């Protein structure tokens, strides 16, 4: 997706692209007020009526844990093995935590959240201190987080990125962007 985005920006220098970091609910509100042409967030699989979502990037959630954690020797971690763990998360308004709670409940447990913070970097800092574990998109494992190890889950939990837009308000620039990102 990164290379496709770069190419789009290079090939369309007259298209003004503004990046505004907003939580999914805020992006949706901006889309509904037509103050935003498109939003990008994880797991936008069921947009409201009149909106379309297009998957841009396939991704999965991993478990992040302190290096010395008792599950660190596992090459893949069954979700059920997290039943008695303490979790550090972000509030549901900032992240996919409601979705992840439902996934955990489907295998028979409700995660015990010991801390909620607003930034993923703070979540991982707390994990490195041994405060708890977290479920986080695999893109975070590409960065160096001292004291934290990432393990795939035995059950794939999607963390796919989607672009969301109003079906009847597609601008020529958005058509070009969608075409570039779909390649």
PLM-predicted stretches and their roles:
Residues 25, 32, 36, 40-50, ...:
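A ligand-binding cleft/hinge motif common to bilobed small-molecule-binding domains
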Residues 148-183:
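A late-sequence structural motif
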Residues 52-62, 134-139, 146-160:
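Short beta-strand->loop
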Residues 42, 86-107, 171-175, 179:
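Secondary-structure junction motif
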Residues 50-61, 65-87, 172-175:
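Flexible hinge/capping segments at coil-to-helix
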């Amino acid at each position: 997706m990164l290379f496709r985005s770069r190419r789009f920006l290079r090939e369309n220098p007259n298209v003004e692209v503004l990046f505004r970091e907003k939580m999914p609910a805020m992006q949706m509100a901006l889309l509904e007020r037509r103050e935003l042409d498109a939003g990008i967030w994880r797991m936008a699989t069921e947009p409201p009526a009149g909106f379309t979502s297009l998957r841009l990037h396939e991704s999965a959630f991993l478990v992040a844990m302190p290096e010395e954690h008792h599950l660190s020797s596992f090459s893949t971690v069954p979700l059920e093995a997290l039943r008695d763990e303490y979790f550090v998360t972000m509030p549901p308004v900032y992240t996919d935590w409601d979705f992840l709670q439902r996934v955990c409940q489907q295998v028979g447990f409700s995660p015990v959240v010991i801390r909620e913070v607003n930034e993923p970097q703070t979540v991982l800092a707390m994990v490195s201190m041994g405060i708890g574990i977290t479920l986080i998109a695999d893109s975070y494992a590409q960065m160096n987080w001292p004291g934290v190890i990432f393990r795939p889950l035995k059950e794939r939990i999607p963390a796919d990125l989607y672009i969301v837009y109003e079906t009847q308000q597609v601008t020529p620039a958005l058509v070009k962007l969608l075409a570039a990102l779909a390649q």
